[in-house]
């Protein structure tokens, strides 16, 4: 299977073509379609030869994730192609495991408003497994875990917690996670992972005059 992977949830955006375990990756903050063209060129593939598009759904940069989803949606409208969505927290954990990290880790991503997304993963020589579901916690809760010696990983995590390990989610790992998966989704159902409720103010009832 030839997979186009788009991971735009962090400041270090990446695009990759993954096929048969090999990958060709473009990193940086370049224009997305230029990065896609670079990855296709390195893989010696045409757009029409792709079998699937995988998208990192966050949590992370809402604008970046929306951009990746829009590209996947537009691609599917132009030419029917299966789409896959993968949690960026899962990508970070898998990347840490591929880098040799083992044991229990907590993936930490900035959720703004003084809060953080947190998910726990168990890393072994055979892979990574979710041990704590993703949720939003206070900065104090993360500080308490750091003080207890827990391993914190994530993009820019050391900006807040100096003992953490900075790991950006990469499209190459996303593509490898997508290999063999069949939980495809239609473009109109693909949404960023965003655990907050939508904030809105209900309009007051109209005043009666007279």
Language model regions located:
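Oxyanion-binding and handling regions
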Residues: 1-34, 45, 84-210
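DPxDG-like acidic metal-binding loop motif
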Residues: 52-83, 88
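N-terminal glycine/serine-rich phosphate-binding loop of ATP-dependent small-molecule kinases
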Residues: 1, 36-62
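Short, conserved active-site loops that position catalytic residues or coordinate cofactors/metal ions
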Residues: 33-36, 67
């Amino acid at each position: 299977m030839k997979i186009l992977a788009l991971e735009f949830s962090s400041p270090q955006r990446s695009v990759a073509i993954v096929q048969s375990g090999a990958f060709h990756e473009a990193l940086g903050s370049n224009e997305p379609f230029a990065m896609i063209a670079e990855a296709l060129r390195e893989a010696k593939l045409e757009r029409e030869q792709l079998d699937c598009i995988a998208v990192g759904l966050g949590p992370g940069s809402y604008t970046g994730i929306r951009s990746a989803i829009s590209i996947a949606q537009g691609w599917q409208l132009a030419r029917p192609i299966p789409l896959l969505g993968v949690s960026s927290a899962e990508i970070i954990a898998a990347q840490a495991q591929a880098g040799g990290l083992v044991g229990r880790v907590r993936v930490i991503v900035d959720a703004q408003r003084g809060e953080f997304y947190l998910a726990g993963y168990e890393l072994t020589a055979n892979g990574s497994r979710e041990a704590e579901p993703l949720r939003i916690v206070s900065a104090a809760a993360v500080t308490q875990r750091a003080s207890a010696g827990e391993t914190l990983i994530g993009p820019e995590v050391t900006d807040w917690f100096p003992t953490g390990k900075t790991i950006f989610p990469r499209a190459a790992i996303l593509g490898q996670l997508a290999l063999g998966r069949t939980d495809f989704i239609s473009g109109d159902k693909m949404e960023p992972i965003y655990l907050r409720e939508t904030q809105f103010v209900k309009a007051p009832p109209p005043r009666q005059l007279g």
